[in-house]
């Protein structure tokens, strides 16, 4: 069994520069994600949590340091290669679902598979349907985005993130726009899928109950990640 980290970074730093103004956000962060591990990133608003996720996903460039995703040094990749790496190895879930309103749930989940290529549309639909079933929405596959509730939209977004079978899902406040009951349901579903699919999750959240169910809770403060809690499962 391969126990190599699915994401690993060394001395990761990020400073935003505007003219003479320098805003340090991250300073020499060391971080690794094991296969199947679930990690919560917590911290005050503006601490740099979303920036950290963007760096891990190759959506922003670090000022210093290195990041490996499934063994690939993303600093050495072109933008096109980063896009291919994201499609193959990473899934993304955001506070806002970012579903395309002109398509139904099934079509939205199909999109990452069709972008990747090498799969017939029929088989992409079959796989997308299977993942909608995993998130409890097999009965809503043909419904357009506007016909879905907030919780259902986020479930579709979760299925879309998982359908390519990534090594890790990066989630930024995935329950932030939901009421408490729906947030609990989406959080529990996320944990269930983490266990059943053995896909790692790195989740930025202000939801303390959700964070406390993770394997590790890391606090981002003053540019550094500090361990708050760790569990042995």
From Swiss-Prot:
Positions of ATP binding: 43-50
Disulfide-bonded cysteines: none
CC per GO annotation: plasma membrane
Subcellular localization: Cell inner membrane
UniProt-recorded Gene Ontology molecular function terms: ATP binding; ATP hydrolysis activity; transmembrane transporter activity
Lineage, uppermost ranks: Bacteria, Pseudomonadati, Pseudomonadota, Gammaproteobacteria, Legionellales
Oligomer and partners: The complex is composed of two ATP-binding proteins (LolD) and two transmembrane proteins (LolC and LolE).
Protein role: Part of the ABC transporter complex LolCDE involved in the translocation of mature outer membrane-directed lipoproteins, from the inner membrane to the periplasmic chaperone, LolA. Responsible for the formation of the LolA-lipoprotein complex in an ATP-dependent manner.
Name this protein carries in UniProt: Lipoprotein-releasing system ATP-binding protein LolD
Gene name of the encoded protein: lolD
UniProt enzyme class: translocase
EC number: 7.6.2.-
GO terms of biological process kind: lipoprotein localization to outer membrane; protein localization to outer membrane; transmembrane transport
Membrane topology: Peripheral membrane protein
Family: Belongs to the ABC transporter superfamily. Lipoprotein translocase (TC 3.A.1.125) family.
């Amino acid at each position: 069994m391969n126990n190599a980290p699915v994401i690993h970074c060394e001395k990761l730093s990020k400073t935003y520069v505007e003219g003479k103004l320098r805003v340090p956000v991250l300073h020499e962060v060391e971080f690794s994600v094991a296969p199947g591990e679930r990690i919560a990133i917590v911290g005050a608003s503006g601490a740099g949590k979303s920036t950290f996720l963007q760096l891990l996903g190759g959506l922003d460039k670090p000022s210093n340091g290195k990041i490996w995703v499934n063994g690939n040094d993303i600093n050495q990749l072109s933008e096109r290669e980063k896009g291919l790496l994201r499609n193959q190895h990473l899934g993304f879930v955001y506070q806002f679902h970012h579903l395309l309103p002109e398509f139904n749930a099934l079509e939205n989940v199909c999109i990452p598979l069709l972008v990747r290529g090498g799969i017939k549309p029929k088989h992409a639909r079959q796989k997308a349907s299977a993942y909608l079933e995993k998130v409890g929405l097999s009965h809503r596959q043909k419904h357009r985005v506007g016909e879905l509730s907030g919780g259902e939209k986020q479930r579709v977004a979760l299925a879309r993130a998982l359908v390519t079978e990534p090594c890790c899902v990066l989630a930024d406040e995935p329950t932030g726009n939901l009421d408490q009951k729906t947030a609990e349901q989406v959080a529990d579903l996320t944990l269930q899928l983490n266990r059943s699919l053995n896909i790692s999750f790195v989740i930025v959240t202000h939801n303390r109950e959700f964070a406390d169910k993770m394997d590790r809770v890391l606090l981002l403060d003053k540019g550094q990640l500090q361990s708050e809690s760790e569990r042995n499962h």
